[in-house]
């Protein structure tokens, strides 16, 4: 996974089912993108860890637009795997 994969990711949205607050998710995605960009440049400063991503919590939404939880959770699993690979190097 590369930083541009994170930057380009678009999550599905939900209004009637519980979702995740978009701002919370977007803030985490920006930290992940910055971390991956740092690894790509071999100069990651203050990287977010796989453990931090795995334990991230988001404000729930309901009856207003939020990101689809399954979309976000599936992508977070991919991010955790990618970060673990970088951390093992």
Regions found by a protein language model. Give the residues of each.
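Acidic, negatively charged sequence signal
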Residues: 1-89
């Amino acid at each position: 996974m590369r930083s541009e994969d994170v930057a380009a990711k678009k999550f599905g949205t939900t209004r009637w089912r519980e979702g995740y607050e978009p701002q919370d998710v977007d803030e985490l995605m920006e930290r992940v993108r910055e971390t991956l960009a740092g690894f790509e440049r071999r100069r990651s400063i203050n990287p977010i860890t796989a453990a931090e991503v795995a334990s991230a919590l988001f404000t729930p939404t309901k009856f207003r637009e939020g990101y689809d939880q399954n979309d976000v959770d599936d992508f977070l699993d991919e991010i955790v795997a990618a970060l673990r690979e970088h951390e093992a190097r």
